């Protein structure tokens, strides 16, 4: 175990809550009022002996996605899957988030004229039907929400020059996602992004992970043997929260380096933009688990810097895919703010957030602020809201702007709200009360001693 994590690059940077009620990576949620997706067709079987074009790396072909729609896809890499005994191609769907990149069999590529013609005919029919529909204008805010939910990737032209340059460099380094699946606990999960597992581990189509110690293995046989030997039944560190079957452990990266490295490698499979570190010592990790007779099963986590010069209360945050859409993402967000309240500070997640992270944080902030505004009577400033919630003033302003509840007047932001407007927002499913909330009575935690000294001097 000790040798395994020593050389591993680890992820402990950009935040990315993965999914509270948003479409998953394989879903194609259509915007309200749009026509069916183009290319949804069952193509005819190619004629016997019909020639196929040769698949070339870097070329673009029509590829059938898991939802049976056809889309242009660039072939990035090829490999022979030793576990399956077949040739596969790694494709990126043009215009889609790289989360949807995947390894596909040759038979999912339109390589014959018969198949290509069938897809083209269906696409032309779709465009004809679309042209007959009345024009539907959408606002910039609606377009932004649609792009976030449907994983629409920004083009380099839409980015500022610095961001575009960094994005190109990041894409070149993490272009191919070799680890396609992982098995952890009772779940087999499709990976979303590249993760820098060391040596041959990073080139395996599938890895097996122990859900307790997070050791990763190349072979199922090794995994089964390890399960019989592993003594762990919960994360290392200290349990700081327990209510019913929900438990949270605080793990210091300095004290449990290998575990935290393995956790970050696991997280990187589901988070795109990450700053990679070889050293996890500057971070503390908060592991959310579901507890049963077998042990404490990892659900998700967030990390935070022990000393954040930017005032961030979260460095990285993730709910594992099998546990998404059950309220755990917002629970982790709420938990991070409970810690900030005990530290008597305000905090914000490290930027940039992933698309799903933006949706989850914005939904959480909105719910918290709406609950306060609904019950409060009297005068309330943005500074007051920040002190009550530990949410930064900038995050509060941007959230209230999205709710049309703040105006800029005489050089400052002023809250403009009516009880009716608050109630209308609270009726929306987007801003409803999270299914799992943090019970502060069950939180057994105090700031580190050096932070307590700083607080006493304020």
Curated annotation (Swiss-Prot):
Residue sites binding acetyl-CoA per the record: 317, 319, 325-327, 329-330, 354, 363, 408, 432
Biological-process GO terms, alphabetical: dosage compensation by inactivation of X chromosome; myeloid cell differentiation; negative regulation of DNA-templated transcription; negative regulation of epithelial to mesenchymal transition; negative regulation of type I interferon production; neurogenesis; oogenesis; positive regulation of DNA-templated transcription
Pfam families in the cross-refs: MOZ_SAS (PF01853), Tudor-knot (PF11717), zf-MYST (PF17772)
Occurrences of domain MYST-type HAT (ranges): 174-447
Composition bias, Low complexity: 1-15, 25-36
Binding positions (Zn(2+)): 210, 213, 226, 230
EC assignment: 2.3.1.48, 2.3.1.-
Domain annotation Tudor-knot: ranges: 55-110
Motif Nuclear localization signal per UniProt: ranges: 140-149
Binding site for propanoyl-CoA: 317, 319, 325, 329-330, 354, 363
Modification type N6-acetyllysine: residues: 113, 274
Keywords in alphabetical order: Acetylation, Activator, Acyltransferase, Chromatin regulator, Chromosome, Disease variant, Intellectual disability, Metal-binding, Mitochondrion, Nucleus, Phosphoprotein, Transcription, Transcription regulation, Transferase, Zinc, Zinc-finger
Catalytic residues (UniProt): 350 (proton donor/acceptor)
Effect of residue 350 to Q: Abolishes histone acetyltransferase activity without abolishing non-enzymatic 'autoacetylation'. Abolished ability to regulate mitochondrial gene expression
Family to which this protein belongs: Belongs to the MYST (SAS/MOZ) family.
The name this protein goes by in its record: Histone acetyltransferase KAT8
Species for this entry: Homo sapiens
